[in-house]
């Protein structure tokens, strides 16, 4: 298994493959453009862009927190993939972000009110994708992973 870390490759490829010139991560025109695309070609473009960072195994981790926004595209691009999603206690997740100084992203993390609203929206979207993807979306509780890593790893 290879770890790509936290990269922007997915957003870059989705933006390019949408056919819509934009500096935004995603907008309605881009979603419409991607809806008409063969997502396997999008998956190939993504893998081609990160190939130099991959190991020999076909399994890799891309851990950018914003990737939950793209679960629908990820599921279509890799129809056989299982997606591991780490879920943390809301208070702990929000406080962890609040006390961290980020250089370029997560501007909402500097206000507890904004963090709370963002987390609620994230949780609604997470539940939506869980209902559609079923067992393809494997949720791992952060706290369980920390306290019993071996059992959680075996479950995966």
Predicted features, each with a name:
Residues 1:
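Glycine-rich phosphate-binding P-loop
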